[in-house]
Amino acid sequence: MAAMPGGPDLAGAGGAVAVAVDAMQVDDPPRASAEEKHGPTIMGGNDPVTGHIISTTIGGKNDEPKRTISYMAERVVGTGSFGVVFQAKCLETGETVAIKKVLQDKRYKNRELQIMRSMDHCNVISLKHCFFSTTSRDELFLNLVMEFVPESLYRVLKHYKDMKQRMPLIYVKLYMYQIFRGLAYIHTVPGVCHRDIKPQNILVDPLTHQVKVCDFGSAKMLIKGEANISYICSRYYRAPELIFGATEYTTSIDIWSAGCVLAELLLGQPLFPGESAVDQLVEIIKVLGTPTREEIRCMNPNYTEFKFPQIKACPWHKIFHKRMPPEAIDLVSRLLQYSPNLRCTALEACAHSFFDELREPHAKLPNGRPFPPLFNFKQELANTHPELVSRLLPEHAQRHSGF
């Protein structure tokens, strides 16, 4: 890892660790096979290209009249092994939407669709509707029609990096707080683990600064005692238990990923830029030090007898520049814990003092406009300790809420 700005050069610390970790035969296993998939109406149409029009029928349930709506594909905004996401315009209403088009296995239900149908939160991307389309090769595609948000946190970060600037702290607070609100909702209400939190999967409205967690293609409802694949989550943001091959993990893997995103916003570059699964663990050990036997047991009991070279943790204040607020460093340290059960929850992160500025009575955006909604909590506060609720809801917000 390169030296952090204002911090130590850690490059020499990892040689012995790399040799030891390599002996663990930690590797990137292949991607999981297709999951259960299924969906609604089948419509004709070729692959989306600029100017191509896709038509579908919506309605027809609960005495709602059926109607045809058409979308004109305007530009591709994302591609991957899953398929393609393109920006489109509804010809009937003029509304801009994002359509995610994924190849559909006719034998299965689509897990992403099932999860998206179960969610409704201001910090989670919303599904408007969905439809199937076919190609001339008789391939079946599922089209998820979602609200369109023009920017991603990745692009916002890149903008500041290109300008050789750090993201202003007020935006770090605003974006991370909303990420944790979104995670608090998905972890508790539908009870889902996202499993791929990274800047590319966080959308930002540049006018309102509202943030939305997107891309539920890897998401899953985790069931205690049921095995899951460990090769999940993009490398820089992968929790150490996943690198250790754990298959019974919890939603705390998302908390680790969010901690990596927070550190990246503060530093202007990834905290753990590993070049492979092995190197990823090396990068983590160079910062957090060698995990204790108990920490290894919490991540994956199969590795407790494995002998790691003893590397001391690098103090967090040496990773970040001297002017970094102690509250920011404290929050990072509570998120990036080896033991999954020691990481704070998403709601506890929201209540952290790092975000106190957002709770001030007359707090506003730097341009004088109001913040996006921050305190309109609903189901995610069910069964939450009253003390935590009072920390999450400032007095001025309590007057307008049901809590």
UniProtKB/Swiss-Prot annotation:
One of its GO terms (biological process) is brassinosteroid mediated signaling pathway. The active site is at D196 (proton acceptor). ATP binds at V77, G78, T79, G80, S81, F82, G83, V84, V85, K100. SMART domains: S_TKc. InterPro entries: GSK-3, Kinase-like_dom_sf, Prot_kinase_dom, Protein_kinase_ATP_BS, Ser/Thr_kinase_AS, STKc_GSK3. One of its GO terms (molecular function) is ATP binding. One of its GO terms (cellular component) is nucleus. Residues 71-355 form the Protein kinase domain. The keyword Transferase applies. It catalyses: L-seryl-[protein] + ATP = O-phospho-L-seryl-[protein] + ADP + H(+); L-threonyl-[protein] + ATP = O-phospho-L-threonyl-[protein] + ADP + H(+). CDD domains: STKc_GSK3. Its EC number is 2.7.11.1. It is an enzyme of class 2 (transferase). It comes from the Eukaryota. Belongs to the protein kinase superfamily. CMGC Ser/Thr protein kinase family. GSK-3 subfamily. Probable serine-threonine kinase that may regulate brassinosteroid signaling. Interacts with LIC. PANTHER family: GLYCOGEN SYNTHASE KINASE-3 ALPHA (PTHR24057), SHAGGY-RELATED PROTEIN KINASE GSK4 (PTHR24057:SF38). This is Shaggy-related protein kinase GSK4. It comes from Oryza sativa subsp. japonica (Rice). The lineage of its organism: Eukaryota, Viridiplantae, Streptophyta, Embryophyta, Tracheophyta.
